[in-house]
């Protein structure tokens, strides 16, 4: 399960600044996530190839009464959900009564907590943080979040030990293997690709059912299972935790993940429901395919788009399900379809299904799209095929000129799966305009017949063999150079 890191502290100690710096590493910020308490933000970040969810819990006012109420309502449950808590203090302001009150609550929770002293730029760190040792939270990590100073050290000493113990792939070795395979195929040699021990067809497809409260997620789960496995009431938020349910359909194993809904801000009254979104985000990360359920009668809301943004940033396969389609007039149905085209036009790779989970209409067709999306996201593609497709795209539409020189695309290989990643090597490829990158992405999608999953394209510059090498003259060139210098001196 992807780890969760919570940022806790008084207002204006720099939590949001650190949050932005952490999440900017992936450019996958989901800020001010609708359905949460005011100023709460969720984002995805990465450190040394390991992903985690970061939560900015908002400020705690610090009065004794305020700590008791605000901590209970906003932060304590976030702390319980988190794997690591970063307790931030202001080194410039010094130790405040609110810091002591917050530290007392954190100590009582017995949650892994690390004290982070922010705003140490221009100060002597040892002297600035000395007062905070009285909080009894052990070592203090001085940083300057606005400038990024000390953040790397914080990540290495605090977050890395809590990440999954999986080393990032050795990119150089993989590329060398792909390049060797490509060279052999170019020379007409018969290349037998090594059999991969991993066969995605042998594993169950993990299917997350997500959406706002009361859109019919649990009803859909029960309809798929054919039994009432999940408690369903006609009121939002009856599901409080993600429920994993194994099942089999048409000889294929699945694991259904029914998640708690994401509710609009201001309508949340039960504190337990406020943090169920963490389970939703973790379920998305854990899933292979995500069913995003939308209420046809309420249309597409900002909460739906925020959840969709997190799914896209996660790179998960996607099937869009428009529920409660029964009983709508033809005129209303046409209006809903127009709204979908307008607001979700950029999601051209996802299948859209119109269903009634309550009555079962259209539910059976979902699994065809789920399997299609899963197969597309896990299919293995050879280097030779990807390079041929890249060359065809280049012939149909040449790359533009950059600083007077044509961008050259050399070869392409697979860089990962679920989502499919295509790595293109060449010269000046990082200067390609976004329009050409989108053209390549769409060309690969059409050529590979990929549906239901996003495709990511990464660009890498080829190494210059003459970089950092000085020109050396041959003996003949040296003699000519001496004669030329003599001639120039005589002419003067």
From Swiss-Prot:
- Domain (KH-like) spans 379-463
Concerning SUPFAM superfamilies, the annotation shows: P-loop containing nucleoside triphosphate hydrolases
Transcription listed as a keyword: no
Question: What molecular functions are annotated in GO for this chain?
Answer: GTP binding; ribosome binding
Q: Where, by residue number, does GTP 1 bind?
A: 9-16, 56-60, 118-121
Give residue ranges for domain EngA-type G.
3-166, 205-378
Q: Which domain of life is it from?
A: Bacteria
Which keywords annotate this record?
A: GTP-binding, Nucleotide-binding, Repeat, Ribosome biogenesis
User: Record-annotated residues binding GTP 2?
Assistant: 211-218, 258-262, 323-326
Keyword Iron-sulfur recorded: no
Q: Pfam families, from UniProt?
A: KH_dom-like (PF14714), MMR_HSR1 (PF01926)
Gene Ontology biological-process entries: ribosome biogenesis
InterPro entries listed in its UniProt record: G_ENGA, GTP-bd, GTPase_Der, KH_dom-like, KH_dom-like_a/b, P-loop_NTPase, Small_GTP-bd
Q: Main role?
A: GTPase that plays an essential role in the late steps of ribosome biogenesis.
HAMAP family hit by this protein: GTPase_Der (MF_00195)
> What do we know about how this protein assembles, alone or with others?
Associates with the 50S ribosomal subunit.
Q: Which family does it belong to?
A: Belongs to the TRAFAC class TrmE-Era-EngA-EngB-Septin-like GTPase superfamily. EngA (Der) GTPase family.
Q: Per its UniProt record, what PANTHER family does this chain match?
A: GTPASE DER
Q: What is this protein called?
A: GTPase Der
Q: Which organism is it from?
A: Cronobacter sakazakii (strain ATCC BAA-894)
User: What gene does the UniProt entry assign to this protein?
Assistant: der
